[in-house]
Amino acid sequence: MNIIDELAWRDAINQQTNEEGLRELTENTSISLYCGVDPTGDSMHIGHLIPFMMMKRFQLAGHHPYILIGGGTGTIGDPSGRTTERVLQTMEAVQHNVDSLSNQMKKLFGKDAEVTMVNNYDWLSELSLLDFLRDYGKNFNVNTMLAKDIVASRLESGISFTEFTYQILQSIDFYTLHKKHNIQLQIGGADQWGNITAGLDLIRKKEGPEAKVFGLTIPLMLKADGTKFGKTAGGAIWLDPKKTSPFEFYQFWLNQDDRDVIKYLKFFTFLDKEEIDALAEKVEKEPGKREAQRRLAEEVTRFVHDDAALEEAQKISEALFSGNIKDLTIEEIEQGLEHVPTVEITKDAKNIVDWLVDTEIEPSKRQAREDVSGGAISINGDRVTDLDFAVDPTQHFDGKFVVVRKGKKNYFLAKVMD
């Protein structure tokens, strides 16, 4: 299957220029293509995966991806999708973010020979104002720039000249990469269409209308309920394991809605049509088993992290679901219970009823007695029904904390104060 046809089957194309021309080009030759990301932070989140999954598919189809880290444009800020001006970062912060994102990209795309990393600071920093105006500014019509959505949406609230010129800088990127590396395709999110087409126009003005260059954007990813994909009540889901643990990352995908899971399997995994169709049938006939969600979580966690991180996430998930947490390490407990209600306690042993009330896990002694007697309370993986039981924080997990399970799903973490 041609890469363009595969992307169409996966519903991964929003807009593209000259579909037949791009299909013919990718059918007969190996092309170079690029996608850019500005270093606004020191980690990508799962929203960034959307265009880079497409880049990975091109790579697997025998094409060569170039990843542009915007060390130059990152000092200015992309107005796309913004209603307000970005706060400018220091050069030191930008460079730190460039280094961090470069490392993440190499992990996703593999060996240096299979992907080329570039930084637009290398050429934009050498561009003088006079050269910018004479060699590039002359090729841009202000009326055309004002009509593009990325600018038009900001005219009422106001846009600085700095952000107004962003599309020129991104166009210079495309032109520079085309001239130096024969890059013929730029990929971006749906909000990048205006910037991408501006780059195509610049190349054709500089190189001639016969230049074989193309643009392709990915659809805006929305959940079945109409809300934006990638956000949770706790904020963004990051690719950096220090910001979002592999367990939390795994759980995010595991908890996807039946209405969304097949769409995400198409987009975020490398499973083929036969495998995805089989999982779609299971969603239809046996939704309670959630096999599609489990496969989605496995595939994406393995791709972003690795097999070891996936196995750890699965181990924690199974332990917390079953309540058998005794075999978990301290680090695994902390990872799995990072977002549960947490209280501070002393090392002193105390009667379970009093202890549950003191930690505010139970609202009253009456409720505490009822839950303990009814078998609803587990301490460090053991169900406790004895009202005379003494909670001793020093007995498990090196005396660092006590894990409480109330009912089947509610966990609490009581940390021992130093």
UniProtKB/Swiss-Prot annotation:
Keywords: Aminoacyl-tRNA synthetase, ATP-binding, Cytoplasm, Ligase, Nucleotide-binding, Protein biosynthesis, RNA-binding. L-tyrosine binds at Y34, Y166, Q170. It catalyses: tRNA(Tyr) + L-tyrosine + ATP = L-tyrosyl-tRNA(Tyr) + AMP + diphosphate + H(+). Its main location: cytoplasm. The keyword Protein biosynthesis applies. It is an enzyme of class 6 (ligase). Gene3D superfamilies: HUPs (3.40.50.620), RNA-binding S4 domain (3.10.290.10), Tyrosyl-Transfer RNA Synthetase (1.10.240.10). GO terms for molecular function: ATP binding; RNA binding; tyrosine-tRNA ligase activity. ATP binds at K231. It holds the Pfam family SYY_C-terminal. A motif ('HIGH' region) lies at residues 39-48. A motif ('KMSKS' region) lies at residues 228-232. Residues 350-416 form the S4 RNA-binding domain. GO terms for cellular component: cytosol. It is found in: Cytoplasm. Its EC number is 6.1.1.1. The keyword Chaperone does not apply. One of its GO terms (biological process) is tyrosyl-tRNA aminoacylation. Belongs to the class-I aminoacyl-tRNA synthetase family. TyrS type 1 subfamily. HAMAP family: Tyr_tRNA_synth_type1. Homodimer. This is Tyrosine--tRNA ligase 1. It comes from Enterococcus faecalis (strain ATCC 700802 / V583).
